Amino acid sequence: MPDYFVHESSYVDDGAIVGAGTKIWHFSHVMPGAVIGERCNLGQNVVVMPRTRIGNNVKIQNNVSIYEGVELEDDVFCGPSCVFTNVINPRSHVSRKAEYLPTVVRRGATIGANATIICGSTLGAYSFVGAGAVPPRDAPD
C-alpha cells in the first residue's frame, strides 16, 4: 500500500515515483517517469508528464499541467490554472519534441493564478510571479 494518497478518480502510472505524504486529488494523472517529492499537494485536474521533477512540499493548484522539461524545486507554489510551455514555436503539423526547452522553478518560488511561464526560463529562489503575468525573461532570486 502506498504511503501517499491518490483520489479514486486519479491515475498514477507504473514508473512514476511519488513521495511519502503526497496527496493527489480528483481527475489528476501522473505519468511514467515523473518524480514527485514528499508532502506535495496536487489539486484537481493536474497532469504531470514524463521526465519532470517536483521537489518536496510543492503545492500545485487545480488545472495545472507540468510538461516534460519542467522542474519544480522544494516549496514551490503553482497557482490555479498557471501554464508552463515547453516549445517556443508550436505548430500542429511539426513535431517539436526534440526542441523542448527546460524550465526551472527554484526553491520557494510562487507562481500566481493564470500566469504563463515560457519554456527555457528560470524563476529564482523565492521569486514571485503575479496572477496573469507572462514573465518575458528569467526572474532573479
Labelled PLM ranges:
Residues 126:
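P-loop NTP-binding/switch modules centered on Walker-like glycine-rich loops
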Residues 2-8, 14-16, 23-123, 131-133, ...:
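Flexible, glycine/small-residue-enriched loop-and-beta-strand segment within the central core
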